[in-house]
Amino acid sequence: VDDRHVVTKAAYNTPVTFCEIFPPDNFPLYFYREPSAPDLELTWEDLPLDAIRDASIFWISVTGLSKEPSRSAHHAALGTRDRRRFTIADLDYRPMFWKDKETAHREVSKILPKVTVAIGNREECEVAVGERDPERAADALLEAGVELAIVKQGLEGTLAKTRTERVEMPVTSVTTKNGLGAGDAFGGAICHGLLSGWSLEKTIFAASTAGAIVSSRLECSTAMPTEPELLELMRARRDEVAPGLTDL
């Protein structure tokens, strides 16, 4: 990890987050970010715009749109990025960071034409485009301007659509210990698949499997799988999850 572009905000405390673990599906989070968090105090002057423009992949979370000056900084970054390939918006909606859903919808709508990939669960898609049904949500994201829409559906799997391709991927089943971090693993595998030139089916299978691996472990960041580990489980589960996939 290259930290040359990390900035500090001396007037603000480092945020703290506590989580509780109630398997299989209840993992509440408690955020301490008052009066504000340093990440929401970023301004466009803090941004390495050349690095953002030239990055092979650029990922934002819509939480950064919840408050100024971070909101304007995100628009500056996306303006510099100018819809280059693999400009990704994580539709990560956390109600405690927003005034209301209407505000979140308005702000997220503004950035969808500026990104090429959007990723979210059904609730997050509903906030972004007013559609909770996976098919309609994916279509609405494509109509808003993205080139790849990925809708996470929990135990029902993942739907991914472009204007010419559709992939519906079942979950890779595991015994869940801690679901926290599974979304980060999913996103990391999406990035890896896109940068590696994998097919959409292989990329979504990898993302689903990476999330499953992390959810089967107690830790979060230290639970992230390596590529060999990921491919090993994908090969073991291919017949039941993605029987038509040949490039493993």
Roles of regions detected by a PLM:
Residues 18-22, 104, 165:
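Short low-complexity, flexible loop/linker segments enriched in glycine and/or proline
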Residues 3, 85-87, 149, 166:
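Hydrophobic anchor at the start of a short beta-strand
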Residues 50-53, 113, 144:
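Structured loop/turn residues at beta-strand edges in well-structured enzyme cores
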Residues 9-10, 94-95, 155, 229:
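Conserved beta-strand edge residues that scaffold enzyme active sites
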Residues 57-140, 156-158:
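Conserved beta-alpha-beta core of the PfkB/ribokinase-like small-molecule kinase fold
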Residues 1-62, 231-248:
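Conserved N-terminal subdomain of the carbohydrate kinase-like
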Residues 79, 130-248:
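Conserved phosphate-binding/catalytic region of the ribokinase-like
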